[in-house]
Amino acid sequence: MIIMRNYKFKLESLHQNQKVFRRCTVHSTVLHIISLHEDWSTRLTYKLSLYYCKIKNCYTTFKFEKSNRSIITRAERIINVQHLRRCKDIVDNFSGLISILLVLIFCINLSGCNTSKRLAYDNKYSYKELSKDDPHNLTYIGHYKVGKNYKIKGKIYKPYTPKYFTETGYASWYGGRKDGFHGKKTANGDRFNRNLLTAAHKTLPLPCLVKVTNKANNKSVILMVNDRGPFKKNRIIDVSQKAAEILAFKNQGITKVRIEYLPNETEKFLKKINLKKTENKIFANNYKESLFTKVTKNNQCSINCHIKLVNLKYKLAVNP
């Protein structure tokens, strides 16, 4: 029970992010309702509506930053001569109102104590959920590689690390049940998994992050390049089966795309998975033995989870 001056409010319901307080008086026609709207990505917004005999006399909006400090951003009174004085007395009693709202915040904090760890970019997912496709893939088994020039079908390819890179052309996907790629080693020693957000490119460093956009429907996804290919005419990138599902071209097989190399996100990603940029494979393996015997910094987040985190950062879908 919460008391504000001579007004008593009782908590009636607590579900679907709404807290409703009703005034406990002899006159049941007089209601005071406080509704709560939660926006976890920005702030908590509280709206207080005061009703007198089914007439809306006062409307006040409270906004709370994550620091839980109250900021009254709007106080609007609808003029009604008969109830103006009574309305003003209640609305101006900010200390009482703030006390009520602080109790609401306390309820929210209690409800959040037992929830699993949530992501900064999207409260919908947990690390465990994002790691469901590779829950044991907590250490990166591949090595960093740019590689030397190589020749395939009479054509020479020159791998390099660009500062800026975009390319437009056709994408295909691999990892179907009949093509035999699932579970095979990639060009940098990683293990290909058709359910992860990965791709193959002819010249980009391995691994690196690229943004792939389907020109037909403008759907985008950020992928980790960990293999070489494709080597068919007019194909610029091969994506995993999961990526093809997200980009919505699995059934048609190929689609026109635009790819963009993300150097800054790649640097951050390499640090998160504890992978040092070196062309020396032996050194990379030694480095792996000393560091990768321990799980990554967040022992609940797999390699694919880290890729999904980058997607969520840019508000991109991580599921079809």
Swiss-Prot record:
GO biological process: cell wall organization; peptidoglycan metabolic process
Domain of life: Bacteria
Entry EC no(s): 4.2.2.-
InterPro entries with a match to the protein in the record: RlpA, RlpA-like_DPBB, RlpA-like_sf, RPE5, RplA
A GO term, aspect molecular function: lytic endotransglycosylase activity
Gene3D superfamilies from the UniProt entry: RlpA-like domain
CDD domains tied to this protein: DPBB_RlpA-like (cd22268)
SUPFAM superfamilies, alphabetized: Barwin-like endoglucanases
Keywords noted in UniProt: Cell wall biogenesis/degradation, Lyase
Pfam families assigned: DPBB_1
Chain's role: Lytic transglycosylase with a strong preference for naked glycan strands that lack stem peptides.
Family: Belongs to the RlpA family.
HAMAP family reported for this sequence: RlpA
Family matches, as NCBIfam families: rlpA (TIGR00413), RPE5 (TIGR03776)
Name this protein carries in UniProt: Endolytic peptidoglycan transglycosylase RlpA
Organism name: Rickettsia typhi (strain ATCC VR-144 / Wilmington)
Gene designation: rlpA
